[in-house]
Regions:
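A residue-level marker of the well-folded mature domains of exported/periplasmic proteins
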Residues: 1-177
Length: 177
């Protein structure tokens, strides 16, 4: 979802990913985002599609988020995907100051900076907890495994602003089916 949005919003073909602490599930999600935005940028004939990725190793340091975002913006990034809790607030502030678009993750961040935050991918914690409990009770979960859960289970919910063209919104919705 976020990859479709980012790959269609970028004008430079340079996108940034800013995350908190890396973990296996996060890496899988960010790798997919990177793959999707590179492909969409290439399909749109944007030369040298580049994805910059940085980990703050923090969920709280807003100033560090702003610093990382400014570094990426300085390298030409015009769309930032943020998976970083409060660190993301600093990223959004830098994006707003520089006219760069943001895609938020986990919570609806659209109202934090209208015109800057183009969309958010909300993570429905209630649905994931229900999925986990159901699968645990049915004996379907094994320890030390990562499960591909999300879109089909309607755990990830895109929330768009008018910054995302209707045809891109429709593409995202079609890919969720």
């Amino acid at each position: 979802m976020a990859g479709i949005i980012g790959g269609n919003l970028t004008k430079t073909g340079i996108l940034g990913i800013i995350a908190g602490y890396p973990n296996e599930a996060m890496e899988t999600l960010l790798d997919q985002y990177e793959k999707d935005v590179r492909q969409l940028a290439a399909d749109r004939k944007l030369p040298n599609a580049t994805v910059l990725r940085a980990y703050a190793n923090s969920w709280e340091d807003e100033e560090l988020g702003k610093e990382i975002a400014n570094q990426m913006i300085g390298k030409g990034a015009d769309v930032l995907f943020i998976y970083a809790n409060k660190v993301g607030n600093g990223c959004i502030e830098a994006a707003k100051e520089n006219g760069v678009k943001v895609i938020g993750f986990s919570e609806n961040q659209n109202d934090l900076a209208p015109g800057t935050v183009a969309a958010s991918i909300k993570f429905d914690f209630g649905k994931i907890y229900s999925w986990i409990l159901e699968h645990y009770m049915d004996g379907k979960l094994n320890g030390n495994e990562v499960y591909g859960v999300g879109i089909e289970e309607e755990i990830f919910i895109p929330i768009f602003t008018d910054e995302v063209p209707k045809e891109v919104q429709q593409t995202v919705e079609n890919n969720m089916k």
